[in-house]
């Protein structure tokens, strides 16, 4: 583990070099102040959706328990973004996607970067890892559901509301927390 300054990216504590994705993380932390941990993976199924340029639709209750809707995929990055401050711009395309689509990052704790892979976040590092695992499982299940029924759309809104809000809404009653 290495502690870095969100303003400068400089190492504050620890013996390791900061991740090459530090600027992506800093952009997300600065734009979304409720984030307490971020995880970036290249997990197989979620990355397949990212490479296809597709979000992960909310097709089932496993996803609905943690993500209040589709896990979005960003637009492709421009040549200028790729050739410039690539890592910072990676964060910016995620931020832009959430702002343009009016998605609350606390309600949808993850995104796919087009042609790249998933980023997930949470209230802390363990929550971010957990959300990354759920994101990958949702991608796995959706891929298989779409293989079985290519015309399958998202789950009905009422079921999404029930599963998400019983854990995260006012008067939440599901679980031990």
Residue ranges of model-derived segments:
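Glycine-rich flexible loops
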Residues: 1-177
């Amino acid at each position: 583990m290495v502690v870095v300054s969100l303003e400068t990216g400089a190492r504050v504590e620890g013996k390791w070099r900061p991740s090459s994705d530090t600027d992506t993380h800093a952009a997300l932390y600065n734009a979304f102040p409720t984030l307490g941990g971020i995880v970036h993976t290249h997990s197989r199924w979620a990355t397949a959706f990212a490479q296809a340029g597709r979000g992960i639709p909310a097709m089932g209750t496993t996803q609905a328990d943690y993500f209040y809707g589709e896990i979005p995929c960003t637009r492709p990055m421009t040549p200028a973004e790729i050739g410039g401050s690539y890592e910072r711009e990676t964060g910016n395309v995620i931020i832009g996607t959430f702002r343009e689509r009016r998605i609350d990052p606390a309600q949808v704790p993850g995104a796919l970067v087009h042609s790249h892979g998933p980023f997930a976040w949470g209230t802390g590092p363990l929550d971010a890892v957990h959300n990354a695992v759920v994101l990958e499982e949702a991608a796995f299940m959706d891929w298989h559901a779409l293989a079985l029924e290519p015309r399958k759309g998202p789950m009905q809104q009422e079921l999404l509301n029930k599963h998400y809000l019983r854990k995260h809404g006012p008067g939440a009653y599901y679980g031990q927390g």
